Design a protein with these regions (language model features):
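Active-site-proximal alpha-helix that buttresses catalytic centers in soluble enzyme cores
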Residues: 29-141, 146-150, 188-198, 202-207, ...
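Bacterial N-terminal signal peptides that target proteins for export
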Residues: 2-15, 19
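Generic beta-sheet signal
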Residues: 62-64, 171-177
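C-terminal segment of classical bacterial N-terminal signal peptides
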Residues: 18-26
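A polyampholytic, Gly/Pro-enriched intrinsically disordered region
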Residues: 158-169, 218-224
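All-alpha RGS (Regulator of G-protein Signaling) helical domain and cognate RGS-like helical scaffolds
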Residues: 143-152, 156-164
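A short, structured loop/turn motif at beta-sheet edges
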Residues: 165-171, 201-204
Length: 224
């Protein structure tokens, strides 16, 4: 009987240890699950552009630079927001995010990367990112936030059209938006906060030539 009891005890202890290990190893989701790319499509793959070539190309113009807004306070969300201008009930930028946006703008000025237009999702965090970085922003309904839910995969068709349209003048277009719209039209991986995708419009589609973290812009000059 004692042997049976000891064996049962070992089994119970092993089960408890396995359960606890699973609980310790579990990690909470930090971001909302990204949607499936609209209509099963993603951007045309392109060979990554070398940093020196990227800076030279951006100085010539003709690219769209799609930013995800900089760092935000994830303890708040947009669930009670009544409108795009209802900033008190939306997830805001943190002080770190504001500093990141200013640094992005300073890097663009120092690197002499020309912008002919700055668009932004109407949400407060994206408008603030654009304003702090570049001093201007036009509200763009095409860059609005929200998932592409099943049966509504064409929600971001207007954004795909914007990213596919060639830039006509001698500069680049910056867009401050969100993670979900980008992954819906371009596919994985998800953009980090403050990260940008450099896009070459192709008329009927587009290709991504580079991804740059919020603190990676000045590195382009060091390789030029």
């Amino acid at each position: 009987m004692m042997k049976i009891a000891a064996k049962c005890c070992r089994i119970v202890m092993a089960f408890m240890a396995w359960t606890c290990a699973g609980a310790v190893g579990a990690q909470p989701l930090q971001f909302e699950p990204p949607p499936t790319p609209a209509a099963g499509r993603s951007a045309i793959p392109a060979r990554p552009m070398a940093s020196a070539d990227l800076l030279a190309e951006l100085r010539k113009g003709g690219y769209i630079i799609y930013f995800r807004h900089t760092s935000t306070d994830f303890s708040r969300d947009d669930s009670r927001s009544k409108s795009d201008d209802d900033c008190d009930n939306q997830r805001p930028l943190t002080d770190k995010g504001r500093a990141e946006a200013r640094e992005i703008g300073a890097a663009f000025r120092d690197l002499k990367i020309p912008l002919v237009q700055v668009l932004a999702s109407p949400r407060c965090r994206t408008m603030e990112t654009a304003m702090l970085a570049f001093g201007k922003a036009e509200k763009s309904s095409e860059a609005r936030a929200g998932p592409a839910s099943p049966g509504n995969e064409d929600r971001y068709a207007p954004l795909r059209a914007v990213l596919s349209t060639p830039v006509k003048t001698g500069g680049n277009v910056a867009i401050a938006s969100h993670g979900n719209p980008f992954i819906a039209v371009a596919g994985a991986p998800y953009l980090a906060e403050g990260e940008a995708a450099v896009i070459r419009p192709l008329g009927k589609d587009f290709e991504i030539v580079a991804r740059v973290k919020h603190d990676g812009w000045r590195a382009l000059a060091r390789t030029n």
